Amino acid sequence: MGFLSSAILLLITAFPAAQAGEMINAAAGATDVIPDSYIVVMNEGISESDFESHRTWATSMNSKSRKRAGAFSGVSRTWSATGMKGYSGSFARETIEQIANNSAVAYVEPDRMVNITAFVTQRNAPSYGLGRISNKRPGNRDYIFDESAGRGITIYGVDTGIDIRHPEFEGRATWGTNEINDVNQDENGHGTHTAGTFAGRNFGVAKRANIVAVKVLNAEGSGSTSGIISGINWCVDHARRNNILGRAVMNLSLGGTGARAFNQVATNAANAGIFLAVAAGNDGEDAANTSPASARGVCTVSASTERDTRADFSNFGSVVDIYAPGDQIPSVFPNNARRVLSGTSMAAPHVAGVGAYLMALEGISSGQVCNRIKRLSQPRIRNPGRDTTNRLLYNNSGV
């Protein structure tokens, strides 16, 4: 970089050349990448006007590339509620490389498919999860809890949607947003099942908590990273507008390949004042390789069995904060049905429910919840996995 006069060369150290953004490419052979779809994250601290100007420029660049390379939709989603400004869309390779080289951009990465983390379905199996988290010893089916039961706390179910009219939810469930299609109902059942665990009348932990459905996954239980980022941003904005930051919980029974933007938005949501319970994943491997389980500031949950062992499908590792029941868990399904599922998807809502329960009972804030859960937990898990906690969720019932 040169200047007209040597007298002002000192400015080079004070104002270095603007740095281009980082282009993060998918690993060779990756099967979860959405073709020609990208997530663009802006530099921290960028102003709203500069962000808008950048998007206008990106749209212009995309329009030029469409004339040469075919149809690419360009910018499709934008977000900023968590403090991470960015957008997603479909771009030609030439265009996305120009975007990545823009000095306002921090990084660009591929958009990916994300899936629910349920594992096995078995009908008519017995329940043990509620009894297990409220008794220090296994074998007791009685669920023991304070009558406050999460009253005044809101839990966001970021999932396939929720059957909000199911009698299990007693009118406490409302529809929030849909970031994947135009069908405002749970087409899969997974989201209704997890909501039944964290706040259902019969199957739930926090039986008086409010429930908000945030649909980011389709009938097959799949969605995009960008859609989930939009859903998380919606939750933060909703909590802020309703003055419940610090008194809100988010259940994320989903996950995919480790993604920087996914982890960043999850961390930002936690920092904003929402307690995040996150499924560790069902690949039987280190959860450090998955998102958002590897995000800082979230409470990452592995799945235990009725025998207090790690479920063989459950991910493990140093990023895991707690174990919770996740094998053979019964709960509700759409259209007044019931279903038994297994997976870290079923473990995470136990933790979301206990988080809401403790926030209501003890008056603690969202940022204190995960550490409180870990302090109350019991050292019960046998063979938890390499570098993994052996602590099992417990609601401090005293029994």
From Swiss-Prot:
Signal peptide: 1-20
Primary localization: secreted
GO molecular function: serine-type endopeptidase activity
Domain of life of the source: Eukaryota
GO CC field: extracellular region
InterPro entries: PCSK9_ProteinaseK-like, Peptidase_S8/S53_dom, Peptidase_S8/S53_dom_sf, Peptidase_S8_Ser-AS, Peptidase_S8_subtilisin-like, Peptidase_S8_subtilisin-rel, S8pro/Inhibitor_I9, S8pro/Inhibitor_I9_sf
Subcellular location: Secreted
Domain Peptidase S8: 127-399
Function: Secreted subtilisin-like serine protease with keratinolytic activity that contributes to pathogenicity.
Family (UniProt): Belongs to the peptidase S8 family.
Protein name, UniProt field: Subtilisin-like protease CPC735_033790
Source species: Coccidioides posadasii (strain C735) (Valley fever fungus)
Organism phylogeny: Eukaryota, Fungi, Dikarya, Ascomycota, Pezizomycotina
